[in-house]
Amino acid sequence: MVEERLNELELELVNIEYRKENKEQFLRVFIDKDNGVDLDMCSQANRAIKESFDEQEIPYDYLEVSSPGLDRVLKKERDWERFSGYRVRIKTRKSFPGPQRITGILLGFDSENIAVELEGELLKVPREMITIIRLHPEF
């Protein structure tokens, strides 16, 4: 339902977090668009999402809508395509025989691996060994 409302606004649902903090329920919704989102888009999305959650009677104390940020999590193949060539940080499972934290340039992916350039070398990390991939911008 939320994704449909966001699609009507030509926005993409990136992630939803539902967290309890100090006895209050926070609902955080992360949205994006190919050329980014601004405050006005977040406000429009907030109204649409609030309407949707109220209709479904989903309990929450605070609703926050924002962009996924500069260090966004890359979850979908669409994200990996979009951010190919960007610097990323990958965390791997403890059972991975290589490094647990990898920072390099995202080169691509296939059905089994994520390819990263690490210090001039190609490293293929099995997808099932990855716990999280984030953009890792340099400042």
From Swiss-Prot:
Compartments (UniProt record): Cytoplasm
Family annotation (CDD domains): YlxS_C
GO cellular component: cytosol
Keywords linked to the UniProt accession: Cytoplasm, Ribosome biogenesis
GO terms (BP aspect): ribosomal small subunit assembly; translation
Highest taxon of source: Bacteria
Family to which the UniProt record says this protein belongs: Belongs to the RimP family.
PANTHER family the UniProt entry points to: RIBOSOME MATURATION FACTOR RIMP
Functional description taken from the UniProt entry: Required for maturation of 30S ribosomal subunits.
Name assigned to this protein: Ribosome maturation factor RimP
Originating species: Syntrophomonas wolfei subsp. wolfei (strain DSM 2245B / Goettingen)
